[in-house]
């Protein structure tokens, strides 16, 4: 029973996170990341989203791309 509560809380948090992504490009990026996570057979969570975003940030080639990923990471902690 407790695990269902945690899962629902996590799902709600992820839904709120997506709602905060106001730019279409942010939503596209989040969609790509979610697809990657699910295709890998992993659970979708803040931790998995953050890990993917940090990986992409590390491999970002330009300042705009870095700002984009930093903004998305920031949404996780609002």
Swiss-Prot record:
Domain of life assignment: Bacteria
GO BP terms, alphabetized: cellular response to acidic pH; negative regulation of DNA-templated transcription
Induction details: Expressed constitutively at low levels, slightly induced upon entry into stationary phase at 37 degrees Celsius. Induced by 5-fluorouracil. Strongly induced at 16 and 23 degrees Celsius. Expression is partially dependent on RpoS, it is repressed by YcgE. At 16 degrees Celsius with blue light irradiation, expression of this operon is absolutely dependent on YcgF for relief from YcgE repression. Part of the ycgZ-ymgA-ariR-ymgC operon.
InterPro entries associated with the record: AriR
NCBIfam families in alphabetical order: YcgZ_fam
Cited function: Probably a connector protein for RcsB/C regulation of biofilm formation, providing additional signal input into the two-component signaling pathway. Partially antagonizes the activities of YmgA and AriR, proteins that, via the Rcs phosphorelay, promote the synthesis of colanic acid, an exopolysaccharide and matrix component.
The protein's name: Probable two-component-system connector protein YcgZ
Gene this protein is translated from: ycgZ
